[in-house]
């Protein structure tokens, strides 16, 4: 599969996370944004091999661009070590350092993986494998993973982490092989992402002004595609990923009747998201209302759900609910 520069850039944006990708898009010209978004939407999936090739090329380009700042290529380092330690010992040390770097680069992949996917990926592995990887992960990612483990397993892993000293050099190659096999057996979350879904996630993380500017540019080129992106952005199921403090702010500014309608036919997970952010009396009343089999049209339910999503976008952008600014959130 031969990729052009735009397609490689699209894959890179799809792999670095919505927050980082949105920051990149803000610094591009309208034409560049259009080109990148079009490529992202057309890429339904890509293999781990392609992802690694793109990331490797990006790393090489960065290294070449910065070689005047830091001579860190293998030949230079090998030359220094050979002159210092001799050819044999210098090569042994360099190999050990490179193995350590390669393992850390493999582990770095997990920093961009959804915690639930990460846990699923390592579910059948020995706890020490999970412990070792968590020791080298970004601390915020490690905390997200630990918080999703069962109490028993979390305690075991934390104890192992506390007793962890370092990984033996002789075990580095084995660990690297284990990680590579894990990634081969199951798809990375990057490979599973649909182009439209990825674009929607990136736009959702932007300020409303930036989001609407990009949507307008896309709409000029492809109105049907714009509708699909907007539809993906406005998924009521995504509410389960919103922080509780924003849900509480929403509830305090939302008519209870509208919430009752919006929650008709929703899953238990979504309902519990609201129940746990209400006082017990309100939660009980809402639960009883939802158990009653009164007929409400799908259109009415969708309208109230869209209102809630618009209000949440308002709250996320402003920190509070702003009635004055509400109008600009209607797409």
UniProtKB/Swiss-Prot annotation:
PANTHER family: FLAGELLAR MOTOR SWITCH PROTEIN FLIG (PTHR30534:SF0). It is a peripheral membrane protein. The gene is fliG. A motif (Part of the EHPQR-motif) lies at residues 125-128. Belongs to the FliG family. The keyword Cell inner membrane applies. Keywords: Bacterial flagellum, Cell inner membrane, Cell membrane, Chemotaxis, Flagellar rotation, Membrane. Transmembrane segments: none annotated. One of its GO terms (cellular component) is plasma membrane. This is Flagellar motor switch protein FliG. It is found in: Cell inner membrane; Bacterial flagellum basal body. The lineage of its organism: Bacteria, Pseudomonadati, Pseudomonadota, Gammaproteobacteria, Enterobacterales. It holds the Pfam family FliG_N. FliG is one of three proteins (FliG, FliN, FliM) that forms the rotor-mounted switch complex (C ring), located at the base of the basal body. This complex interacts with the CheY and CheZ chemotaxis proteins, in addition to contacting components of the motor that determine the direction of flagellar rotation. InterPro entries: Flg_Motor_Flig, Flg_Motor_Flig_C, FliG_a-hlx, FliG_M, FliG_N. The record marks 160 as: Part of the EHPQR-motif. It comes from Buchnera aphidicola subsp. Schizaphis graminum (strain Sg). GO terms for molecular function: cytoskeletal motor activity. Its main location: membrane. GO terms for biological process: bacterial-type flagellum-dependent cell motility; chemotaxis. The keyword Hydrolase does not apply.
């Amino acid at each position: 599969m031969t990729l052009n520069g735009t397609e490689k850039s699209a894959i890179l944006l799809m792999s670095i996370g919505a927050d980082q990708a949105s920051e990149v898009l803000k610094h591009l010209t309208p034409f560049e944004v259009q080109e990148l978004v079009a490529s992202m939407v057309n890429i339904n999936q890509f293999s781990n091999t392609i992802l690694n090739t793109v990331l490797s090329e990006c790393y090489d380009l960065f290294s070449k661009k910065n070689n005047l700042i830091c001579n860190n290529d293998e030949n230079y380092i090998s030359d220094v070590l050979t002159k210092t330690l001799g050819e044999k010992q210098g090569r042994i040390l360099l190999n050990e350092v490179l193995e350590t770097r390669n393992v850390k680069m493999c582990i770095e992949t997990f920093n961009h993986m959804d915690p639930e996917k990460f846990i699923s990926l390592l579910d059948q592995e020995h706890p020490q494998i999970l412990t070792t990887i968590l020791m080298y992960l970004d601390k915020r990612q490690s905390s997200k993973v630990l918080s999703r483990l069962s109490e028993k397993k979390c305690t075991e892993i934390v104890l192992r982490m506390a007793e962890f000293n370092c990984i033996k050099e002789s075990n580095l190659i084995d660990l690297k092989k284990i990680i590579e096999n894990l990634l081969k057996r199951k798809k990375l979350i990057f490979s599973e992402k649909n182009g439209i879904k990825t674009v929607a996630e990136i736009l959702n993380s932007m300020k409303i002004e930036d989001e609407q500017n990009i949507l307008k540019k896309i709409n000029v080129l492809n109105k049907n595609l714009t509708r699909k992106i907007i539809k993906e952005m406005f998924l009521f199921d995504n509410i389960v990923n919103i922080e509780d403090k924003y849900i509480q702010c929403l509830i305090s500014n939302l008519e209870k009747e509208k919430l009752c309608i919006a929650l008709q036919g929703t899953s238990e997970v979504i309902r519990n998201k609201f129940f746990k952010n209400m006082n017990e009396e309100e939660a009980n009343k809402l639960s009883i209302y939802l158990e009653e089999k009164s007929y409400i049209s799908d259109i009415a339910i969708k309208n109230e759900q869209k209102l809630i999503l618009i209000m949440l976008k308002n709250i996320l952008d402003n920190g509070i609910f702003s009635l004055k600014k509400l109008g600009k959130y209607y797409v």
